[in-house]
């Protein structure tokens, strides 16, 4: 993984052991999305999305992220406790509310 991702994780105090970068093409056709999967200190499974698109994140895409996380849960037969998204663009207020209502942690980065 590159240095920028480690800096994002360190800034938000996300510490995952056995972290893996998942192949995004298995779950989505989005080229601006990176998916990381790992286990935290309390043995909970975490899913981290890194979105580097320049366009605004809309509610439709927030629903797609939820579908992708469900696909990952069924593929690995686990229950994801923490879902996080890092995004570099603006986010629609309805998309942010949708994600937060589904227990997502949302962080922007520049």
Label every PLM stretch briefly.
Residues 28, 34-72:
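Conserved catalytic cores of phosphodiester-cleaving nucleases, focusing on short active-site segments
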Residues 78-110:
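Short, compact, well-ordered microdomains
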Residues 15, 25-29, 62-66, 84-85:
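A short linear-motif detector with a strong N-terminal bias
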Residues 2-5, 48, 52, 78, ...:
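A near-ubiquitous, low-amplitude feature marking generic local secondary-structure context
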Residues 1-36:
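Acidic-basic catalytic patches of nuclease active cores, encompassing PD-(D/E)XK
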């Amino acid at each position: 993984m590159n240095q920028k991702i480690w800096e994002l994780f360190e800034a938000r105090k996300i510490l995952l052991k056995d972290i893996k970068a998942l192949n995004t093409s298995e779950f989505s056709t989005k080229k601006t999305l990176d998916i990381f999967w790992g286990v935290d200190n309390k043995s909970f499974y975490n899913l981290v999305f890194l979105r580097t698109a320049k366009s605004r994140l809309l509610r439709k895409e927030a629903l797609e992220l939820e579908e992708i996380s469900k696909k990952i849960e069924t593929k690995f037969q686990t229950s994801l406790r923490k879902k996080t998204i890092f995004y570099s663009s603006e986010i629609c207020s309805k998309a942010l509310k949708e994600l937060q209502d589904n227990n997502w942690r949302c962080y922007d980065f520049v």
